[in-house]
A protein has these predicted regions:
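Short, well-ordered loop/turn and helix-capping segments at boundaries between secondary-structure elements
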Residues: 87, 113-116, 185-187, 191, ...
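Catalytic domains of carbohydrate-active enzymes that cleave complex glycans
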Residues: 169, 178-197
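Aromatic- and carboxylate-enriched substrate-binding clefts and catalytic-loop regions
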Residues: 2-171, 175
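Glycan-recognition and catalytic regions of carbohydrate-active enzymes
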Residues: 193-217
Length: 217
């Protein structure tokens, strides 16, 4: 993956430390599909080849990131990516993306869209940010045009006054119940559990409840 538009990356090959066929095989044994995270610009450069190759390998979807604009060229890029992925039965989770404008209806393989000031902001935010208030406000605004991938589920929690942004050990403002409530309130067909596996192991009751919540009602 690359966020730098000028950096050339061959997305048809993984780094040597990642044995992708073995990961896909293990996922099938556990009945779990594999999703690849890709920058949209590097994906666009090898779009047809990447979709064909990874579809044949058994990849189920792409989490496409770093568009970060909504001009005409960017919109055309999104449509091209969505159309090509649909041809190869690959679903999309669009991050770094503008809010839905109907493209999710045109391309049903788009299962979720960020387009929101999501929980990742906890990595670099400050206690000047009132995240709990924001979290109960944007459903009445941002969710009007379509679903939202907020990536909730933070298990390390604190009050607003004690909150400190931390990239490597992020915490969230509010309570764990506040985080759990997002899975119920937010329209998010392909939702995330954004914290680390060890955090959920420590909060088994919360993790089990989150896993029991339907993606759609």
């Amino acid at each position: 993956n690359s966020k730098d538009d000028n950096e050339k990356v061959d997305i048809l090959h993984t780094i040597k430390e990642i044995n992708l066929p073995e990961i896909i095989k293990y996922g099938k044994e556990k009945k779990v599909g594999v999703v690849l995270w890709l920058g949209i610009n590097v994906l666009s450069e090898q779009l047809e080849e990447a979709c064909k190759q990874y579809s044949q390998m058994g990849i189920k979807g792409f989490k496409v990131d770093f568009l970060d604009r909504n001009d005409q060229t960017a919109v055309e890029q999104v449509y091209k990516v969505a159309e090509t992925c649909a041809k190869y039965n690959i679903f999309l989770d669009l991050h770094g993306m503008y809010a839905p404008t109907g493209y999710n209806r045109t391309f049903p393989n788009i299962l979720n869209v960020e387009g929101v000031w999501g929980l990742e902001q906890a990595k670099w935010g400050s206690n000047k940010d009132d995240m709990p208030t924001y979290c109960v406000t944007f459903p009445f605004l941002r969710m009007m045009p379509g679903y939202v991938d907020y990536t909730p589920g933070g298990m390390r929690n604190c009050t607003k006054d004690h909150f400190v942004g931390d990239y490597y050990w992020p915490q969230t403002q509010g309570t764990r119940c506040h985080q759990i409530g997002m899975y119920i309130v937010y329209d998010s067909p392909l939702t995330m559990m954004a914290d680390s596996p060890t955090a959920y192991e420590k909060e088994e009751e919360c993790a089990s409840f989150i896993a029991s919540i339907p993606n759609q009602y």
